[in-house]
């Protein structure tokens, strides 16, 4: 059985737990997998525990093996993920992550699992290689297919009867692996939130996937005779089809309320009054500039989901800035800044009311584009109390969503400096506390 891309959406967790428990009551041997992105700090209890509550819940599910997604590998600071699995009752498998000391101590590159009947299953796992972001977080992420081919040369793996890939790589890479690496027998996929309700077959390799947010739970039945596969059945079961129990809503609410309670115990500051949404956006940009030592900033007001409270706690700040994003800094000339502004502002009206998803954004809509350190109007830039020569370099700070999302080609084509480890709300918190 398998789940993936829960992203701290615990709404279906009670159903998944019952499904796992009920389908484990069998004479057949059962393995339970999590294929990554279980953790997402947009949930207050995940945020306050740095993901450790997710591991506790995975333990309660009886997970046997797991791998990581980008929300663990990038969404968590290196120090956080190095602590994440200390109390895990399951093994983490990951074959394409290193640091200067070598492989992470909390993961194995592969596992050879021998069934009661003596059939040897090779379990391998890889996460999507976001090179630009793993590096600043202190990791070296390797090409997944090259790593897979190298691991397949290991005598233990080569001698296995059946090879299963736990893939947080996305559907396109899964299909590519199925075509190029015939040694893999089964790929359990994730990352792109795709669903294979009855599985797929590509070049003789079986593919399974179970969506996102717990909207499906995966079940794969494997039959072996003399250590060779004789039958396979793949299913992704919609959790909406599973029975609810009256305690489910209270359980999910308790997780959220407990997170908010723990965050609320930490007062950040007392403001003279409750600021407006625009004033909050201005404050966020000041924090960004201070943290990044930048001259200029651009954000969208939709980053501030709700205005800051006057007596601002970490719970309030989490509600206002729930996003899983950091800062990116560029060095630009006046001409380059004009190009960037034209690119962003020409799309501003179109994006304003769009419900944005992904790339770390956890708000409702994009909102208006605002600036700090300069104004842009009618294709012209006016700097705040500063004369800028045409060839002078200035530093511009943005949220990294602008860098990774497909909207702004003027940014994606440039080399930016990604700033780790703090998330946006951590940057704002430090600014308000006077710690920058």
For each predicted feature, which ranges?
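A short C-terminal boundary segment appended to hydrolase-like catalytic domains
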Residues: 225-313, 317-320, 432-436
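Hydrophobic beta-strand segments of well-ordered beta-sheets in folded domains
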Residues: 66, 296, 394-396
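Acidic, metal/ion-coordinating pockets
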Residues: 1-239, 277-282, 287
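A short, polar/proline- and glycine-enriched secondary-structure boundary/capping micro-motif
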Residues: 132-136, 219, 241-249, 308-309, ...
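Structural motif
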Residues: 167-168, 301, 398-401
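A generic structural motif
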Residues: 33-36, 189-191, 299-302, 355, ...
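Structured segments of extracytoplasmic/periplasmic soluble domains
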Residues: 19-22, 154, 286-291, 340-347, ...
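Feature captures C-terminal
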Residues: 10-12, 308-436
